[in-house]
């Protein structure tokens, strides 16, 4: 059952709401416009608030849904987390879009909502505060993601390894943003 859910999670994660919505609306392809990222923040830049919100909600749901299905199927929290990571991998490397996807932040937040809601609230709150103070989405993601680790280590230790892997994946996908942050070239809102 685990492998079936992991495959379904990857396939669901591969549905890029940013790319689909940009095509349906006639907006520029987010992979080749703006920041080049197929995510909600770039959709805000390219297509406006409405499509950015729809992208965000779609990306959250594709992280949340596989975790909830894994729970209903009787998988333990550790396995649920790995199923959720498969959805994030689908977002990062979407099968349907030549393996060029987003950075996984919203999908990871949806995954966290299903695993341990207080960790998701902590991450979302940290993201919102950092973004409000800096107007920099990538910095907000890089601060918010690892903040969940101590809480999970204390409350849900069986999810710590998969969430640590998730953190590394998200930081890795933001490696160009890190270079730009240190060079003072990162985009702000």
UniProtKB/Swiss-Prot annotation:
- Give the way it sits in the membrane: Multi-pass membrane protein
- Which enzyme class? transferase
Cellular-component GO terms for this entry:
plasma membrane
Question: Which catalysed reactions does the entry list for this protein?
Answer: an acyl phosphate + sn-glycerol 3-phosphate = a 1-acyl-sn-glycero-3-phosphate + phosphate
Q: Which UniProt keywords apply?
A: Cell inner membrane, Cell membrane, Lipid biosynthesis, Lipid metabolism, Membrane, Phospholipid biosynthesis, Phospholipid metabolism, Transferase, Transmembrane, Transmembrane helix
Fill in the subunit field for this protein: Probably interacts with PlsX.
Q: What is this protein called?
A: Glycerol-3-phosphate acyltransferase
Which species is listed as the source? Pseudomonas putida (strain ATCC 700007 / DSM 6899 / JCM 31910 / BCRC 17059 / LMG 24140 / F1)
